[in-house]
Amino acid sequence: MVQKKSQSSKTVTVEQIGSPIRNSQIQRATLKGLGLNKMHRRRVLEDTLCVRGMIAKVQHLVRVIDES
């Protein structure tokens, strides 16, 4: 069954501020999973526990810009 997204779903804006060079493959894959692949790129993501966990794993490489 397909679930529809509600209009009031929370989002979080994330910006990549660090380079994945000299970081582990897991951290590179986490950045790719967040949709970030180049410096200073921003993504608006749904605010879920999974996304928050991914942000926590690469907290030295990303910055949370906006939580709405």
UniProtKB/Swiss-Prot annotation:
GO BP term (any one): translation
Keyword Ribonucleoprotein annotated: yes
SUPFAM superfamilies, alphabetized: Ribosomal protein L30p/L7e
Pfam families linked: Ribosomal_L30
InterPro entries in the cross-refs: Ribo_uL30_ferredoxin-like_sf, Ribosomal_uL30_bac-type, Ribosomal_uL30_ferredoxin-like
GO cellular component: cytosolic large ribosomal subunit
Keyword Transport on entry: no
Keywords of this entry: Ribonucleoprotein, Ribosomal protein
Transmembrane region(s): none
GO terms for MF: structural constituent of ribosome
Top-level taxon of origin: Bacteria
Family to which the UniProt record says this protein belongs: Belongs to the universal ribosomal protein uL30 family.
Complex and partners: Part of the 50S ribosomal subunit.
Protein's name in the database: Large ribosomal subunit protein uL30
